C-alpha cells in the first residue's frame, strides 16, 4: 500500500501522468475506493482469476489506454507497447530499443 500511496503522490505532483499497478482483486477494490475519494480516474483490466491491472492517472492517458485494454499486455503491438511504456514514464531510449526489437521480430516472422 505504501507504493500505491507514493504513486498517488507522484501523480498529484505531476511526476507521472499514468500509473499501472498489478494486484489482487481485494487490493484493487480498496485502491479504487481511495482513487474515487480523491477524484482520480482509473480503470481495471482483468489479468487472471485472482489478479487485475489497475491503471490510474490523467483522463487523456486513460482514454488512450482504453483503445487497447481489451487484450493482454503481452499481445500489444510494438506501437501500443511503446505508447504505453512512454505514458508510464519508462526510460524512452529503452522503450525505443524495445520497440525496434519487437518490430524486427514481428517482421521476421511475417
Functional labels for PLM-detected ranges:
Residues 1-110:
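Domain-length accessory/inserted modules outside core catalytic folds
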Amino acid at each position: 500500500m505504501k507504493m500505491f500511496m507514493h504513486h498517488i503522490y507522484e501523480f498529484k505532483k505531476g511526476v507521472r501522468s499514468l500509473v499501472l499497478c498489478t494486484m489482487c482483486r481485494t487490493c484493487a477494490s480498496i485502491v479504487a475506493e481511495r482513487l474515487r475519494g480523491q477524484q482520480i480516474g482509473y480503470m481495471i483490466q482483468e489479468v487472471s482469476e485472482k489478479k487485475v491491472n489497475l491503471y490510474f492517472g490523467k483522463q487523456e492517458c486513460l482514454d488512450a489506454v482504453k483503445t487497447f485494454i481489451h487484450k493482454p499486455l503481452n499481445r500489444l503491438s510494438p506501437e501500443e507497447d511503446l505508447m504505453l511504456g512512454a505514458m508510464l514514464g519508462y526510460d524512452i531510449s529503452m522503450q525505443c530499443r524495445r520497440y525496434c526489437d519487437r518490430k524486427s521480430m514481428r517482421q521476421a516472422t511475417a
